[in-house]
């Protein structure tokens, strides 16, 4: 089996975890108590969903997941919620005091007290796997636990499980709904620390998700539940190929192979379509061509940036539901002629396509309409550097005045770490810039003279 272990860190990670596992259970027909009426084989079968669920002798399906937070309230909701019987109590790990939005607390002071316990639980899950393929880590950039503890965990996972893939789903801080003033500090510190440990990171910009909820679902004041259910759909689309048999089964390493041209440039942009409310879906066709076209609209992206200003390095389209290759090829051909999609000149303009015949599922009573087909596009584009530039700018404004820095230094960090992290981010922006520059024609001419 090619198992994946999901690790949900901090409030954002845990709440997205709730949305994802709720959706996975619906997709696979697993009840809140872990029983699965449709699954006739008792014990670990060789079904695709076993990559995400382990099976006990009693026929109970348990998520291969760990929930970690440095304070108990958020995970207590899981312990008392609808799906409390689904998880093993040891999978829900809480500390006593939170990281107080402080990266240094999550990474040094409080984080180090709980890290060994967390790694121990992850080890138990890993031991149940026959062929662990990697980890999916869910966290936010802005929180103390999400930023600090995640980066500590990623460092330790690299030591313990060297070659296993680590994919991140990171919540990028949104200006509208900021939960902390120091989000830019935390984001840049965590990105710097995890950059070399993460193989691929899907960023989700809260603001972009907010706008999609407002615009496409007519929700005036979206709550975190609305946001997380939408994020859940995206995560589900990305992981569907790992959990179902499809025409093109992508495993974790295949994502990297197709989306990551250089180790540092591993931040694909995710776009999902159709996001539509039930009353609207009734009147629309939502053909393959339409949903594919929607993926190239900046309005449907998970991060606010404009790919029309950047260049693509890679592009994957993951379809699910009633989709045939003929329609997909036609849709892509149309887009290639109509849209100005610029690829970097060193990359062939191929679109990688995955089709999964399992139609998208929606949470009953949720905001999204049940549709026949959906698509999630993962593209690696130089435009995502805009997101880093925004964050770096905010970091600079505060750091120029050394605002709030004493809180970090007081928890055992050194001021040098700030400037080091900021330099690394500047280098990352530069990397993106260089990738997009056309390869120098001059080089070829000089070689010609030598011969």
From Swiss-Prot:
CDD domains: alpha_tubulin. It catalyses: GTP + H2O = GDP + phosphate + H(+). One of its GO terms (biological process) is smoothened signaling pathway. The keyword Protein biosynthesis does not apply. Some glutamate residues at the C-terminus are polyglutamylated, resulting in polyglutamate chains on the gamma-carboxyl group. Polyglutamylation plays a key role in microtubule severing by spastin (SPAST). SPAST preferentially recognizes and acts on microtubules decorated with short polyglutamate tails: severing activity by SPAST increases as the number of glutamates per tubulin rises from one to eight, but decreases beyond this glutamylation threshold. Glutamylation is also involved in cilia motility. Some glutamate residues at the C-terminus are monoglycylated but not polyglycylated due to the absence of functional TTLL10 in human. Monoglycylation is mainly limited to tubulin incorporated into cilia and flagella axonemes, which is required for their stability and maintenance. Flagella glycylation controls sperm motility. Both polyglutamylation and monoglycylation can coexist on the same protein on adjacent residues, and lowering glycylation levels increases polyglutamylation, and reciprocally. Keywords: Acetylation, Cell projection, Cilium, Cytoplasm, Cytoskeleton, Disease variant, Flagellum, GTP-binding, Hydrolase, Isopeptide bond, Lissencephaly, Magnesium, Metal-binding, Methylation, Microtubule, Nitration, Nucleotide-binding, Phosphoprotein. The modification 3'-nitrotyrosine is found at residues 282, 451. Mg(2+) binds at residue 71. InterPro entries: Alpha_tubulin, Tub_FtsZ_C, Tubulin, Tubulin/FtsZ-like_C, Tubulin/FtsZ_2-layer-sand-dom, Tubulin/FtsZ_GTPase_sf, Tubulin_C, Tubulin_CS. The modification Phosphoserine is found at residue 439. Its EC number is 3.6.5.-. The record marks 451 as: Involved in polymerization. The active site is at residue 254. GO terms for molecular function: GTP binding; hydrolase activity; identical protein binding; metal ion binding; protein heterodimerization activity; protein-containing complex binding; structural constituent of cytoskeleton; structural molecule activity. Its main location: cytoplasm. Expressed at a high level in fetal brain. The modification 5-glutamyl polyglutamate is found at residues 443, 445. It is an enzyme of class 3 (hydrolase). GTP binds at residues 11, 71, 140, 144-145, 179, 206, 228. It is found in: Cytoplasm, Cytoskeleton; Cytoplasm, Cytoskeleton, Flagellum axoneme. GO terms for cellular component: axonemal microtubule; cilium; condensed chromosome; cytoplasm; cytoplasmic ribonucleoprotein granule; cytosol; extracellular exosome; microtubule. Dimer of alpha and beta chains. A typical microtubule is a hollow water-filled tube with an outer diameter of 25 nm and an inner diameter of 15 nM. Alpha-beta heterodimers associate head-to-tail to form protofilaments running lengthwise along the microtubule wall with the beta-tubulin subunit facing the microtubule plus end conferring a structural polarity. Microtubules usually have 13 protofilaments but different protofilament numbers can be found in some organisms and specialized cells. Component of sperm flagellar doublet microtubules. Belongs to the tubulin family. Tubulin is the major constituent of microtubules, a cylinder consisting of laterally associated linear protofilaments composed of alpha- and beta-tubulin heterodimers. Microtubules grow by the addition of GTP-tubulin dimers to the microtubule end, where a stabilizing cap forms. Below the cap, tubulin dimers are in GDP-bound state, owing to GTPase activity of alpha-tubulin. This is Tubulin alpha-1A chain. The gene is TUBA1A.
């Amino acid at each position: 089996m090619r198992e994946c272990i999901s690790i949900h860190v901090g409030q954002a990670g845990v709440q997205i975890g709730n949305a994802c596992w709720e959706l996975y259970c619906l997709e696979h027909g697993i009840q809140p108590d872990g029983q699965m009426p449709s699954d006739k084989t008792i014990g670990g079968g060789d079904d695709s969903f076993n990559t995400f669920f382990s099976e006990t002798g009693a026929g109970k399906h348990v998520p291969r997941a760990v929930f970690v937070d440095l304070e108990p309230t958020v995970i207590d909701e899981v312990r008392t919620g609808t799906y409390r019987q689904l998880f093993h109590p040891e999978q829900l790990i809480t500390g006593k005091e939170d990281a107080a939005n402080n990266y240094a607390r999550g990474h040094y002071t409080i984080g180090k007290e709980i890290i060994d316990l967390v790694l121990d639980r992850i080890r138990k899950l890993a031991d149940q796997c026959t062929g662990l393929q990697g980890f999916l880590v869910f966290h936010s950039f802005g929180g103390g636990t999400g930023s600090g503890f995640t980066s500590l965990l990623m460092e330790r996972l690299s030591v313990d499980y060297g070659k296993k893939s680590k994919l991140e789903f990171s919540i990028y801080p949104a200006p509208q709904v900021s939960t902390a003033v120091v989000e830019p500090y935390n984001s840049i510190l965590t990105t710097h620390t995890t950059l070399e440990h993460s193989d691929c990171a899907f960023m989700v910009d809260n603001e972009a998700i907010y706008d999609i909820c407002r615009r496409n679902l007519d929700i005036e004041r979206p709550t975190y539940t609305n946001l997380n259910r939408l994020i859940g759909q995206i995560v589900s689309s990305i992981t569907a190929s790992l959990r179902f048999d499809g025409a093109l089964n992508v495993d974790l390493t295949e994502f990297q192979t197709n989306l990551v041209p250089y180790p540092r440039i591993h931040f694909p942009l995710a776009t999902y379509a159709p996001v539509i409310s039930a009353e609207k879906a009734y009147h629309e066709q939502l053909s393959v061509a339409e949903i594919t076209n929607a993926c190239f609209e900046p309005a449907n992206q998970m991060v606010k940036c404009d790919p029309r200003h950047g260049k693509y390095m890679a592009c994957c389209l993951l379809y699910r539901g009633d989709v045939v290759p003929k329609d997909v090829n036609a849709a892509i051909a149309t887009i290639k002629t109509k849209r100005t999609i610029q690829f970097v000149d060193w990359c062939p303009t191929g679109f990688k396509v995955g089709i999964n015949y399992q139609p998208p599922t929606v949470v009953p009573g949720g905001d999204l309409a049940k549709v026949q087909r959906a698509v999630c596009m993962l593209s690696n584009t130089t435009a995502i550097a805009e997101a880093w530039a925004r964050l770096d700018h905010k970091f600079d404004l505060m750091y120029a005045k050394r605002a709030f820095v004493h809180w970090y230094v007081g928890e055992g960090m050194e001021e040098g770490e700030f400037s080091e992290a900021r330099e690394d981010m500047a280098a990352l922006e530069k990397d993106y810039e260089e990738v997009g520059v056309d390869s120098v024609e001059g080089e070829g001419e000089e070689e010609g003279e030598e011969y």
